[in-house]
Amino acid sequence: SLKIEYSLCKHQSTKLWNLLNSEPYINTLGSLSGNHAVQHAKAGLKAIYLSGWQVAADANSAGEMYPDQSLYPYDSAPKLVESMNNALIRADQIQHMEIIDGDMKKENKVDYMLPIIADGEAGFGGPLNVFELAKKFIKAGAAGVHFEDQLASEKKCGHMGGKVLVPTGTMIKNLKAARLAADIANVPLIILARTDANAAKLITNDHDDNDKPFLTGERSPEGFYYVKAGIDQAISRGLAYAPYSDLIWCETATPNLEEAKKFADAIHKKFPGKLLAYNCSPSFNWKKHLSDDEIASF
């Protein structure tokens, strides 16, 4: 059969991986459009983040303003990745011609081809849905995609109450599905595993051995099981996801360096050098929890 090459995804994924392994950290900002992405490149950023809440609010194919609950059509984010990459490629082409024509000095060249890390939400379903979504991100030229361990049909913003976890094993199946899509496409797509277990108090069922230590024995009116939220539950899941992801992200309710360090230390004790991600969210009340100096150095 015909072998299709996904050269943009392959190039950008490799570029992101090299950046992650050569820089102390990579700071990104959420980009809402192709023009926005171009401005981020001009500002000197080395990567671009595509946020699901931004897609929900103002960049989805339904043309609606949604809350951050995965209500938008599932192909919205891949389409935005494609739009951003098209804008970045065009900016790079224009710059190339300006250098050739002598209108711009080569030493002033901007790196427009920034790798895009996209929000895959909770996958919009099960492993098959995750597989298809990952394929669309690959076709669009994404460098990385993150998936979270919430129940897709009950998905909430990471800083809202009422989050429902899927069993640890179910999340691992989703991560495997994303990796399978990348392997079939022959691309080194960067896969990030996000856990919402630090704040989530509900889980769909009680069958997974990794989740049993955190069960309270109580049930919700919807039939979900209550679990003990907290950093220990998040660590348990981070350790379980580590073999199946390139980076691990622990979603926190506040900008908390102590929690971040505890999570990082626990992961690195078993998986030395494992790459981690942190959400410096605009939803945080930074002033309430940190001083100006702490915010500046966060």
Feature-to-residue mapping (PLM):
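Alpha/beta enzyme core
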Residues: S1-F298
